[in-house]
Amino acid sequence: MNALFAIAALVAAAVAADKSPESPSSVPSGTWPDGKKAAFYLSFDDGCPTQTTNVFPLLEKYRIPGTFYVCPGWDLFKKYESAWSNANEYVFLGNHTMTHGKIPDKAALDRELAGCNAVIARLRPKQKGPVSFAIPAAESMHKVLEITDEEIAETYKRHNLVERWLWHGYPVQCKTIPEMEAYVDKVIESGGVGHMDFHGVGGDWLDPGLEYFEALMKKLDSRRGEIWFATHIQIYERLKNRK
């Protein structure tokens, strides 16, 4: 799969020309609820089947939410649609376009985004508010099609989307369990926003292995008292509202 650099989101209105901004490494003291030192979110791209079988139960076990960026036009997604529809309360869906395919122009982009949003609304009707969006197979919308910053902002507003922060996860960063655990500690120390982004977990493509993911969940749980576990959208909205 070519979705390795599926990217990430706006906290401000500006859109980076070549690459989406990284998540904030630090924020003012008192930003996070309940005296938490840092925020952390999990995200999963492409709607891999192993996400439904391996990730869903672990999110529920550890009470940590995750956002899954799905491509509803894929036959593979349709095959497991009931699992997505009946997923537990820790599962949130994000927009990864309908097909993860070539987008030749702005009209095609609108169709891809609107179609994906419609499926998300149908499968998860209780999920309200803006929808998190991960650009498929690129680090910027400018690398997907010819489009201006203003047109990107207008498109996101029209479809009620918030772009995810720059991809961070295996196999680009945190290639080993010790590296991943050190990253979690660093996020807490800095007081910003941490996240780990995945594709397959225990199978499928770009898979770090189920042992790796279970180690991440145990590490996050061990520092639960210091971390606000939230979705990308929840973190985005908290930062936006505290400006």
Roles of regions detected by a PLM:
Residues 1-8:
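Sec-dependent signal peptide recognition
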Residues 8-17:
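Hydrophobic h-region of N-terminal signal peptides that target proteins for export
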Residues 20-53:
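Boundary/entry segment of secreted carbohydrate-active catalytic domains
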Residues 23-34, 66-67, 74-76, 158-166, ...:
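C-terminal domain-boundary segment and adjacent tail
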Residues 38-40, 60-148, 158-171, 195-204:
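Metal-dependent polysaccharide deacetylase catalytic core of the NodB/CE4 family, i.e.
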Residues 39, 50, 54, 108-111, ...:
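Extracytoplasmic/secreted proteins, especially bacterial periplasmic and envelope-associated proteins
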Residues 44-47, 97, 200, 232:
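Active-site metal-binding loops of divalent metal-dependent hydrolases
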Residues 173-185:
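A Trp-anchored, charged/polar loop motif used as the substrate-binding/catalytic surface
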